[in-house]
Structures are given as C-alpha cells and as structure tokens.
Amino acid sequence: MKFLDSVRPQIIAATRIVVGFLFAQHGLDKFFGVFGGSSGDLDAIHILGGAIELVGGALVCIGLQTRLAAFACSGTMAVAYFLYHQSYGLLPIQNDGELAAVYSWVFLLLAAIGANGVWSIESSSDSSRA
C-alpha cells in the first residue's frame, strides 16, 4: 500500500483530530449533558475523568501537548476499563468495554507518535521559531 506513504502524516493528523474531537464530546456530555448524557451529581472520579476527556481530547484534537494529553487520555480509559467494565466479563465484547479499550490503545499510539508535524499547534509553533 505504498500509495498511502505520501499521505501518512495527514492520515495520522486526521486520526488525531477526529479521535480527540470525539473524546472531548464525552467530557462535554458528562458535564453539560449536551448529547443526551446526564450532567450534574458527578462523583470525584467522574469529574476527573470528564475533565481529562474534555481537556485532554481538545488538546489532542488541536495538537497541543499532544503526547502528554494522549498519555493521560489513554490511562483514563485503561482505568475506566478495569474499574467499570472488567467486572462484567473477561473480554471487551462481553463487558461493553470496546470503546474504552480502543480509546486507550489509540491514545497510547498517539502518545508514542505525538502531533506528527502537521495540522497542529505544536507544528505551527515549531515552524514560527525557526
């Protein structure tokens, strides 16, 4: 699939933007109920998780502090999986934990890759310093 090699940075950037945007929506939903979720009466762990979803997702989306934000998002989803989903079954398909597992692994990949130099605040600030 050599034809994808020339657009690899753009594909990675598009993935980063979309995944960050989708993740931030979970935080918005927790805090404000904007997508049908229940806002209010959150315990401390849900407040922390919602804050990481909202802020971390937004940072990943815009490409600012991408590696740190993606790592925090990955850890948050790993905690969500093991605290809330794992007790309902061994496999993600059994315990409705597929989304948490996929988010955790995609964010870990993005933490390893970083903003990747295109379509990010990090890349625009790096080029302005040169």
PLM features per residue range, with description:
Residues 1-32, 46-51, 55, 62-130:
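Extended, low-polarity transmembrane helix blocks
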Residues 35:
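Short, flexible helix/strand-to-coil boundary loops that buttress conserved ligand/catalytic motifs
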Residues 38-48:
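Structural signature of hydrophobic alpha-helical transmembrane segments
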